[in-house]
Amino acid sequence: IDERDHRFVIGERTSEGFYRAEASLDSAIARGLAYAPYADLIWCETSTPDLDQAKAFSEAIRAEYPDKLLAYNCSPSFNWKKNLSDRDIARFQNELGAMGYKFQFITLAGFHALNHSMFQLARDYKSRQMSAYVELQEAEFAAESQGYSATRHQREVGTGYFDELTQAISGGQSSLSALSGSTEQAQFDED
């Protein structure tokens, strides 16, 4: 047992042989302090969105390492509205920033966004057929002015690069290129 963890080990073992340990703010702080000399930033993980715990963690780490960067997982596993008011949610990240949490992230945000949007598209496609997809495509076109670039999916995934690579390897004789002459290239304007 690592000496830094010893006071948190309960003494029991799991059926797999792992020691059971106390999951607490104190154990998180002790672990953070142990890693602080070696880590670029220290990640705080709480079981609910809890500014009091985040503050206690920050104060303990920064008391010994005042310039240490902190990270906080604004977890999608939290039921945010069940735990915080709209006002508290709106100020949550600013409060974290004031405590020194410079890297704030949502693990799996893309997973949730992708799955929810695909669910909506499938539901709408069932009832409105192609009109549902065209609505999505028009939203993509509208988002291009804000930097969205995935409307042209072949270009987005690097098809042009692999076409050039294939041509270089084959001495310009490959019939496997995908982007040149494609429907995407023909129908989507390059601005």
Where are the language model's segments positioned?
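Flexible C-terminal active-site loop/helix
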Residues: 129-180
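Alpha/beta enzyme core
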Residues: 1-72, 76-78, 82-105, 119, ...
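Short acidic/histidine-rich active-site segments
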Residues: 106-111
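C-terminal helical cap(s) of enzyme catalytic domains, especially alpha/beta-barrels
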Residues: 115-130
